[in-house]
Design a protein with these regions (language model features):
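Mature catalytic core of soluble alpha/beta enzymes
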Residues: 1-153
């Protein structure tokens, strides 16, 4: 398994089992959920919780919306899962950011446009959007968060 910041690719297995990875809760020190990461699969997360500053009670993250020139607001994290294919690790990085930057009502369409089938979006209002296929893969550790999941197709 190779971990570079918010991106992980599985190379081989953990003994006879796939690697199990955690998805960071954007506002708590623990994982919000885990999932199995089989060999060749890659997972990438973009979020507002690693590199940011706060000014007058507002959080400003390092991801800039190119349409406005300002840091993205309204979303805490986006996690994508990419199936085995050439450059899966790179795709896990470059596909999470456009979904993160998209307007809330356009996130599912952006994922579909980029052919991302497995994604998880944690909005700032604690609403959680997840593709049906991603929902099936997740083992929720934060049961309160699980109650806020809205499945998208």
């Amino acid at each position: 398994m190779v971990n570079i910041g918010g991106n992980i690719i599985a190379l081989g297995q953990h003994g006879t089992q796939p690697w199990r990875v955690g998805i960071q809760h954007p506002r708590k020190p623990d994982a919000i959920a885990t999932l199995d990461l089989p060999s060749g699969w890659a997972i990438g997360t973009s979020g507002d919780y690693q590199r940011y500053f706060e000014l007058k009670g507002t959080r400003y993250c390092h991801i800039i919306n190119p349409a406005t020139g300002y840091p993205v607001q309204g979303v805490q994290s986006v996690t994508v899962l990419i199936s085995p294919q050439p450059n899966a690790g790179v795709l896990s990085d470059v596909t999470s950011k456009p979904i993160f930057i998209s307007q809330p009502d356009a996130r599912a369409a952006m994922a579909k446009q980029m052919e991302v089938k497995d994604y998880l979006v944690i909005e700032s209002d604690t609403k959680i959007l997840a593709s049906a296929s991603m929902t099936k893969r997740l083992n929720w550790l934060d049961k309160q968060a699980e109650k806020h999941v809205v499945e998208t197709h």
